[in-house]
């Protein structure tokens, strides 16, 4: 499908390389051997101070890039030569954030530097294509510096982002360790497609989709749990103008950069943590006396008389003639039976170092988090290796490799009235016991059966139910960069993702309410499931940078991304094993066994172009365009462009920013930064199903004969959802960047939204998927 397209793109990229090299070559031949520019040498003086202490910083570097530089003395003072008093100076010092200072006509300046890792507009922001100071960005983007997140070692990233970034809603799924949160960036954009932001880790797409529902009720396998937050250096959230990611950028993007060596000297970090998780306060529920009154009223509404109700064993308070008195005259706190306080332990080791040829960062970690629900916990083993290589002055490379293994003991969650212990603890009659008791009031070690209302025993589900989730992922990439000339660079990244999820579940018959199947009543329930994902990803781009007269900066990029993904789900469910000691699927009745699953294979190609222009580091323009092809798109799509019989979505964007604080009329202002932003973009959502546009079939058995039947009605005109976004924003910082303010006004409109349209019953199906 993409062979011809790839060949054509390679030819186009080759032509661009040739033209750029020829341009540089011609420029070198026609230019004088030595540039001579008449520059008036002016001098700027000042002091560089620590923002916290006010003391001068020794050894700070003050420079006008490619022109002059100076180092501060013992008092933090400096002198630097500049051609005009309207330049931008760069101030760097070890252990501090880099700061860009516009002179705006001033001859003397005082600069206060904040410690490294402070979240401000001077920090480098990782955009989809490069890293640049936040002050120079044209889009609605936010950045947080985690730098290992040492203070919150057991959080998953999606939970850690809660309340950190404006416009990003992080809603926790539950209190189960590692289950994480649902992320929504500026609300919902689709009814049936995904609303998850695209996640990028070290330049490669990190798949956070779920390929098959869990067999453990209302549980979710969270890919973010496989990223140790102590391995994360910073996170950038791209809220708009994500068209550079084409049909995957409709919901914005979260760009994660993991930690790497910042210096060649060997550095060892070790952390060990123990956290106490306190049992939450119990929700107010009825006690035994109140529940009897409530139950009597409920039975009366069902038609029972007062005499019949008073004859029930739970209403008779006399032990004489009531052998079940001790069974029904208790005051059990069911919430205490299923919940407890717990401990969490976390151990982390990282070693960084290197030399002129290569630097590395190697980390290993182990974490054990016990849940507040009894018998639930999570064990995580993780390792990560990041390295950077200098093969030559022109040829460099990088490696980012990680492997994480996760084990969880779980229980059913949510409103599951038969098997969820938390729900049952809130609804179970408090006058009952969790254990069997005889007519003398002697309690047995055996757990009690279901009650007269057929309610399950929460203690049985805590102690005798089995629900395991084992999950691992390998995520790795290699990147190479070659400087073709002073202005022209070529780079390529290649990586793979491989993960596997295995689940096992057993629900005993004793003490648990029976389930009803289509052909039987199920007492014990057994199940196993395996989900696999394999994906390979590549991103190759050419980049051209040119600065003219120091004030005009031009950057352009042309690139090609390709991703192939293959997912599979297989499950088996069994019922009614002979005893509760037989817990695997093969021990269930053959006639009741259920098997199923699914497979999915899809390709994605993204051809992208980017052009940027900056004038005096105060006016910034950016234009992006992407052409996206996908095996998911139909053959009769009406929009986009067609290349070699394949339909491509064309998604452009444009953005502009004006840094008013760099203008001369704000030379005496107390405001450190004041920036206006405008952006417009078109983005796509390709979550329309792998085979929705095609005619598919499924096997079916009839009277012992196997055959094929239609699995749905194809929609060959089905295409991507298109989101049009407009954003206007302002960024302000004051008090030496200690106070920052960002406000955005945005409007989003989704076209060609995925919907299920009702059709006549004569087609054999009730709905069809359309735009």
Language-model segments: which ranges?
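Extracytoplasmic beta-strand/coil segments of soluble accessory domains associated
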Residues: 159-208, 234, 243-262
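Short, polar/charged loop or turn motifs at beta-strand boundaries
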Residues: 48-51, 137-163, 171-175, 183-190, ...
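N-terminal periplasmic accessory domains that precede
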Residues: 107-114, 130-135, 157-160, 183-186, ...
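A beta-strand signature from Gram-negative outer-membrane beta-barrel systems
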Residues: 109-112, 164-166, 229-269, 344-346, ...
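Short, acidic, small-residue-rich periplasmic hinge/interaction motif at the N-terminus
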Residues: 29-41, 47-53, 61, 92-96, ...
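Surface-exposed loop/interface segments of Gram-negative outer-membrane beta-barrel transport/assembly proteins
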Residues: 119, 195, 263-330, 371-376, ...
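Short acidic/polar hinge/loop motifs at secondary-structure boundaries
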Residues: 79-81, 204-239
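Short, acidic Ser/Thr/Gly-rich low-complexity loop/linker segments typical of extracellular
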Residues: 68-77
